[in-house]
């Protein structure tokens, strides 16, 4: 732990108090010898004079400049000497002569000044240390959340400021999103060489909005901009503007832009801007809440009456649909950069970046991993290689092999591996269910190719069948949707065909949900039914984002009944397609089930080779190479 004088002083405060009292006890008296010459009793000055005249005083010791005396008194009744303390008057010059005339031994003890000096020093230092400790204690409590000093800082911006950002990330570390990187590299060039653009009348963009699903590299791009630009950099989260007090959000926005103007040219990065930039409207909560005041102030600062030349705002969100239209217009966010999931070449570049510090076995191919992971984001790919490295270390291997890569992909997609099932009727039923999915998907031309079938439980699933879609396809046809419905019904069809209608299980619950959703979208959104080419889905918006409290139905009860009938018809059509394939291919289904129970996992290529011995396997648009 780092040493702190302030903490040491606070902890020493109780010791100072105790030490002060010990100090006072040691140097409290003006005369240290007075404590060693103690008296048994006290005697009045008048009685003392009487004893002097009577000859009962044998010795007198004077202390405190003659103000106090310790006298020895002889008592003939008990035949012993007593010591008594006498307080002497200030004006008694004849006393000394009187004592000498009576032949009484007289000693004078001078005052020791060192005790007074140390007492004075102790009395001075202790209050100073006490006041300093209390001051530091107050300062520390004021800096803590909820401390008394926080009331003065609520309106201050919480943005992290770096005069020369050291993020450790450069554009060379960002891979797989070349289009977005090119857009942002131009922003950096604007800041470094503005004359190139002003010479032809171009203006620097005021804002860039990074849009994309989670894990695609939006924040990483912002770090790269900060590392490359070489200008002051402010970073803040959208949720850090609004607090429990009214007006704090708007005040923090003003303070942020005030600091930015003082350090222009500079960059401001607002992460998760949807926390403060959601669209305004009635909805629930009214139209005058604290978030809207903060948004209004942000709109004014970005492009209001006063300019903010030299300030570029970069924001990131994965919810562009909820942002206010005034925030999205040119002049505030001039550019909207889409940061989407990478394609094959992008995934390959990302994997190469994250594999720099990984020790891969010679047989591991980055190209094969990239082809096997369509739809993976940059964060997913980084997690995949990290999981593979962890598995390698757990298994005490020196390099990451194909087995670790395969297990890591399964873990990222489906979750942790569970305990394998024991041989039983339940295991055989699950095997028929998974083979049913795979056989239907393999024999339907428009279905995605099978990647792997396994009985190893992962997550909530007791068995899994992976299909790898063709990532180059941006649109989906009706035939492909029907093939997916049939493939999803393949598990239930195999259960019915092999075990009978009374032995079907709840394992198809998720499949039926998926089938119903696809069929309903075909009817209500895509116009792929007998109802005709119309869209019947309402888009009233979410209630907390300014939408209505209740979505209004756009069609009559009669149309709703027809929609339900069409959904049921499409689902039943897919069910019959799957049932027919399972019936016709029962022999190969039984063989595949026996093989799956024996090996617990069959990869896609082996599965297709076995099916090809019994039926013609249609050529898919893309077959995924296996690792």
From Swiss-Prot:
The chain crosses the membrane at residues 8-28, 118-138. Its EC number is 3.4.24.-. Keywords: ATP-binding, Hydrolase, Membrane, Metal-binding, Metalloprotease, Nucleotide-binding, Protease, Thylakoid, Transmembrane, Transmembrane helix, Zinc. The keyword Coiled coil does not apply. Coiled coil: none annotated. The keyword Protein biosynthesis does not apply. Disruption phenotype: Cells have decreased chlorophyll content, with a 60% reduction in the content of photosystem I (PSI). The PSI that remains may have an altered structure. Cells grow normally under very low light (10 umol photons/m(2)/s) but are dramatically inhibited by low light at 40 umol photons/m(2)/s. Under this light intensity they also photobleach. Reduced rates of D1 processing and degradation are observed. Mutants show increased tolerance for non-ionic stress by maltose but also an increased sensitivity to high NaCl concentrations. Pfam families: AAA, AAA_lid_3, FtsH_ext, Peptidase_M41. CDD domains: RecA-like_FtsH (cd19501). It is an enzyme of class 3 (hydrolase). Induction: By UV-B light and oxidative stress provided by methyl viologen. Its cofactor is Zn(2+). Binds 1 zinc ion per subunit. The active site is at residue 434. GO terms for biological process: photosystem II repair; protein catabolic process; proteolysis. ATP binds at residues 212-219. It is found in: Cellular thylakoid membrane. Its main location: membrane. Residues 1-7, 139-627 are cytoplasmic. GO terms for cellular component: thylakoid membrane. Zn(2+) binds at residues 433, 437, 511. Homohexamer (Potential). Part of a large (>500 kDa) complex that includes FtsH3 and PSII. Coimmunoprecipitates with YidC. HAMAP family: FtsH. In the central section; belongs to the AAA ATPase family. Acts as a processive, ATP-dependent zinc metallopeptidase for both cytoplasmic and membrane proteins. Plays a role in the quality control of integral membrane proteins. This is ATP-dependent zinc metalloprotease FtsH 2.
């Amino acid at each position: 732990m780092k040493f702190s004088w302030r903490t040491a002083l606070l902890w020493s405060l109780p010791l100072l108090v105790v030490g002060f009292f010990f100090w006072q006890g040691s140097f409290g008296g003006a005369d240290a010898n007075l404590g060693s010459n103690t008296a048994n009793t006290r005697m009045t000055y008048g009685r003392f004079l009487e004893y002097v005249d009577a000859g009962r005083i044998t010795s007198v010791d004077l202390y405190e400049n003659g103000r106090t005396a310790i006298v020895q008194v002889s008592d003939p009744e008990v035949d012993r000497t007593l010591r008594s303390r006498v307080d002497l008057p200030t004006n008694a010059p004849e006393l000394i002569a009187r004592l000498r005339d009576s032949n009484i031994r007289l000693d004078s003890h001078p005052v020791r000044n060192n005790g007074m000096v140390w007492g004075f020093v102790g009395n001075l230092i202790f209050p100073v240390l006490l006041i300093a400790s209390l001051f530091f204690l107050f300062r520390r409590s004021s800096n803590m959340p909820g401390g008394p000093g926080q009331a003065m800082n609520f309106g201050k911006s919480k943005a992290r400021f770096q005069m020369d950002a050291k993020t450790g990330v450069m554009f060379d570390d960002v891979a797989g999103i070349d289009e977005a990187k090119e857009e942002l590299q131009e922003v950096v060039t604007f800041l470094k060489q503005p004359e190139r653009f002003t010479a032809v009348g171009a203006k620097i963009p005021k804002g860039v909005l990074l849009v994309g699903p989670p894990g695609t590299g939006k924040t990483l791009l912002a770090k790269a901009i900060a590392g490359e630009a070489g200008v002051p950099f402010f970073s803040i989260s959208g949720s850090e503007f609004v607090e429990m007090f009214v007006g704090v959000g708007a005040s923090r926005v003003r303070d942020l832009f005030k600091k930015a103007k003082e350090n222009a040219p500079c960059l401001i990065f607002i992460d998760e801007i949807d926390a403060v930039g959601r669209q305004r409207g009635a909805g629930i909560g009214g139209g005058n809440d604290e978030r809207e005041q903060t948004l209004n102030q942000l709109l004014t600062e970005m492009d209001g009456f006063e300019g903010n030349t030299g300030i570029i705002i970069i924001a990131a969100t994965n919810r562009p649909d909820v942002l206010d239209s005034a925030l999205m217009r040119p002049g505030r966010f001039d550019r909207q950069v889409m940061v989407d999931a990478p394609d094959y070449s992008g995934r390959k570049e990302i994997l190469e970046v994250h594999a720099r510090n990984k020790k891969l076995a010679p047989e591991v191919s980055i190209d094969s991993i990239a082809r096997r992971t369509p739809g993976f984001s940059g964060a997913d790919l980084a997690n995949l290689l990290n999981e593979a490295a962890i598995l390698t270390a757990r298994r005490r291997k020196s390099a990451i092999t194909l087995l670790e890569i395969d297990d890591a992909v399964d873990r990222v997609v489906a979750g942790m591996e569970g305990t394998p099932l024991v041989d039983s009727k339940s295991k055989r039923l699950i095997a028929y269910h998974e083979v049913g999915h795979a056989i239907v998907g393999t024999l339907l031309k428009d279905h995605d190719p099978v990647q792997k079938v396994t009985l190893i439980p992962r997550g909530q699933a007791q068995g899994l069948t992976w299909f790898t879609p063709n990532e180059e396809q941006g649109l989906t046809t009706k035939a492909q949707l029907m093939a997916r419905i049939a493939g999803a019904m393949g598990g239930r069809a195999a259960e019915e065909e092999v075990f009978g209608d009374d032995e079907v299980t709840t394992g198809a619950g998720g499949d039926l949900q998926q089938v119903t959703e696809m069929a309903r979208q075909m009817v209500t959104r895509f116009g792929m039914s007998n109802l005709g080419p119309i869209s019947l889905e309402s888009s009233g918006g979410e209630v907390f984002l300014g939408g209505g409290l209740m979505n209004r139905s756009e069609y009559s009860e009669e149309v709703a009944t027809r929609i339900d009938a069409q959904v049921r018809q499409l689902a039943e059509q897919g069910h019959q397609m799957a049932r027919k394939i399972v019936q016709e291919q029962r022999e190969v289904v039984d063989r595949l089930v026996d093989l799956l129970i024996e090996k617990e996992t069959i990869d896609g290529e082996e599965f297709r080779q076995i099916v090809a011995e019994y039926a013609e396997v249609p050529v898919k648009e893309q077959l995924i190479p296996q690792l």
